[in-house]
């Protein structure tokens, strides 16, 4: 089983990042990977907090030249296209993101930027998700959110939207 913690838009507010990591470890178990979808603040601090391999993409408020605008991540038998999303106009549409994922032979696309959680699972196409924001939520209930993705031994994927408590 591969367990991946997915978050976005922490904007350097790492107290909720720490809480999310601790919650997952206590309630579900250890994570093997962390994916941060941009507007991270200090990437090195996040990597230190996680203690597992981290894949971090550049958001529209990140200025670390080492961060990529998009990254293709291999996880189990899946390929994940990870990006912040602002360069793909995700606040208005998702087709550009979907096309970018397809061009990179990915079956999962992840983005941030909107601060609103989203999950569209399509086994015949691409699963698209946004974990929302761990520090500045914009959905109706204004709760801090993140996602946990699990890939089992048969490469079946499950997603869970979780709240920082």
Functional labels for PLM-detected ranges:
Residues 53-99, 103-104:
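Helix-adjacent hinge/juxtasegments
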Residues 12, 18-19, 76, 99-105, ...:
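Binuclear metal-dependent phosphoesterase catalytic core
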Residues 52, 120-135:
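Short acidic, glycine/proline-enriched helix-loop-strand junctions
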Residues 1-51, 63-64, 68-69, 141-145, ...:
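N-terminal active-site segment of His-dependent metallophosphoesterases
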Residues 6-8, 33-39, 55-60, 81-84, ...:
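Active-site neighborhood of phospho(di)ester-bond hydrolases with catalytic His/Asp-centered motifs
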Residues 11-15, 40-44, 61-67, 88-92, ...:
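Active-site environment of divalent metal-dependent phosphoester hydrolases
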């Amino acid at each position: 089983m591969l367990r991946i913690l997915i978050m976005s838009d922490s904007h350097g507010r790492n107290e909720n990042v720490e809480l999310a990591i601790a919650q997952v470890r206590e309630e579900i178990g250890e994570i093997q990977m962390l994916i941060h979808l941009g507007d991270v603040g200090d990437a090195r601090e996040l990597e230190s907090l996680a203690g597992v391999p981290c894949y971090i993409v550049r958001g529209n408020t990140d200025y670390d030249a080492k961060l990529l605008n998009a990254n293709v991540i291999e996880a189990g038998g899946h390929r994940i296209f990870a990006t912040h999303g602002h360069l793909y106009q995700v606040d208005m549409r998702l087709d550009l993101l979907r096309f970018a994922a397809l061009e990179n032979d990915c079956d999962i696309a992840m983005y941030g930027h909107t601060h609103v959680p989203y999950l569209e699972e399509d086994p015949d196409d691409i699963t698209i998700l946004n974990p929302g924001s761990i520090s500045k939520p914009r959905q109706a209930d204004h709760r801090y959110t993140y996602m946990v993705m699990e890939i089992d031994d048969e490469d079946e994927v499950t997603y869970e939207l979780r709240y920082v408590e």
